[in-house]
Amino acid sequence: MAAKEVKFNSDARDRMLKGVNILADAVKVTLGPKGRNVVIDKSFGAPRITKDGVSVAKEIELSDKFENMGAQMVREVASRTNDEAGDGTTTATVLAQAIVREGLKAVAAGMNPMDLKRGIDVATAKVVEAIKSAARPVNDSSEVAQVGTISANGESFIGQQIAEAMQRVGNEGVITVEENKGMETEVEVVEGMQFDRGYLSPYFVTNADKMIAELEDAYILLHEKKLSSLQPMVPLLESVIQSQKPLLIVAEDVEGEALATLVVNKLRGGLKIAAVKAPGFGDRRKAMLQDIAILTGGQVISEDLGMKLENVTIDMLGRAKKVSINKDNTTIVDGAGEKAEIEARVSQIRQQIEETTSDYDREKLQERVAKLAGGVAVIRVGGMTEIEVKERKDRVDDALNATRAAVQEGIVVGGGVALVQGAKVLEGLSGANSDQDAGIAIIRRALEAPMRQIAENAGVDGAVVAGKVRESSDKAFGFNAQTEEYGDMFKFGVIDPAKVVRTALEDAASVAGLLITTEAMIAEKPEPKAPAGGMPDMGGMGGMM
């Protein structure tokens, strides 16, 4: 086991604070509409340019082990806020730095760290309550656009694109962000249910120019197992031919004789038909087939339920106004399912989302909800260079997370005003002793840190701005750093999601409280470097005359 180095008391805390400051100082330059960029060197490829706090925090690794521990703890604040709210990472980092700095001063003055932490926890809970009660719901898409714009560092175009995407797929819809090959940033919406399985044979194509198979007012057969022979379903196929409607077969696979027979019938013009593989694998495949059945008002033909293909009648099939299939995807639009049943299925999947602990499962379940409830939107981010596209994609991701958070828990005044107003609920609040009172005072002072930083990044004195806002009785009064004027922040369109502000404060106070109560730090001792090798011994050069 390698030797360890141990630091105690103020020596440990000073080294830790130094690490906290290095990381927080690098992150906080990005805060606000006039925040600056940070350039990050990459071991391969071009450097990365970003204004995303968590991206900066994740890149910082210090050579001094004790300083690095402090930095990593604050990095944890940014990561947790990012995971929970998707935005507000820089605000959380600035708050954590302010709480740690003030807290360590109080510890150095002889106060009890545990009582300070209790005071910090009491004050944080009180302010979080105030933020929740001050939140108001998002009323229209212009407010969604404003939230997105603020989070994208003032780029209104990004805010508008996100508002458009949310309007088209609904608040429950899935919105994904991808890099675009071109210059433009655009929104593409896939309505209906789409899954990533294409036609099993190009002979099913009905539109040769676009290489897609389109079926209008189609029947849909959902089969859980492989189809290798069509013999059992001849009566069903005859019923479909009589109805003169096209048929889509979704099965685990359609192979051999069955596929050949379908293709021959299609080419002879007797049967408008297409076949695709069922989406997903294992249990997820069963669940997705059931989703399609509910959406189209059909039944999944499953041997588990004792259903056989020879007994299937035409009324067991699903129906859809339109089915479009290309070589990679199948889209079912306007299924004939009952609205009440679809809503029941959606709430059932939502229940599973709440209960699951796996991020991957949660993401897949959310996709299923979106496909049943609204649709899927893709924001394709463009730019002049690859570096610009990546930087912009970071901001679109942040803005998208912020707007989702706003829809969930409502909005509050932006620009750090919600935190300064929240501090007013701490007036008159006292703890069990004077050290707890000091902890409450630490939070009251720290809550002004984000507003001060936003102002300072805009080249204005932060103390003056914080003082003016603190003295105002108008809860929406604040400083718009973009235009450098004071006034009603709601009218300026400077708003923040309540969830982001709340999460930033909770995570910052949680980690900062742990740092303040640190009394000893242990790290591996660096290995002593081996001395540089000298010239090898030549063994004497005797005998020379």
From Swiss-Prot:
Pfam families: Cpn60_TCP1. Keywords: ATP-binding, Chaperone, Cytoplasm, Isomerase, Nucleotide-binding. InterPro entries: Chaperonin_Cpn60_CS, Cpn60/GroEL, Cpn60/GroEL/TCP-1, GroEL-like_apical_dom_sf, GROEL-like_equatorial_sf, TCP-1-like_intermed_sf. PROSITE patterns: CHAPERONINS_CPN60. It is found in: Cytoplasm. It comes from the Bacteria. It catalyses: ATP + H2O + a folded polypeptide = ADP + phosphate + an unfolded polypeptide. One of its GO terms (biological process) is protein refolding. GO terms for molecular function: ATP binding; ATP-dependent protein folding chaperone; isomerase activity; unfolded protein binding. One of its GO terms (cellular component) is cytoplasm. Residues 526-545 are annotated as: Disordered. The keyword Chaperone applies. Its main location: cytoplasm. Its EC number is 5.6.1.7. ATP binds at T30, L31, G32, P33, K51, D87, G88, T89, T90, T91, G415, D496. Residues 536-545 have a biased composition (Gly residues). HAMAP family: CH60 (MF_00600). Together with its co-chaperonin GroES, plays an essential role in assisting protein folding. The GroEL-GroES system forms a nano-cage that allows encapsulation of the non-native substrate proteins and provides a physical environment optimized to promote and accelerate protein folding. Belongs to the chaperonin (HSP60) family. Forms a cylinder of 14 subunits composed of two heptameric rings stacked back-to-back. Interacts with the co-chaperonin GroES. This is Chaperonin GroEL. It comes from Paracoccus denitrificans. The gene is groEL.
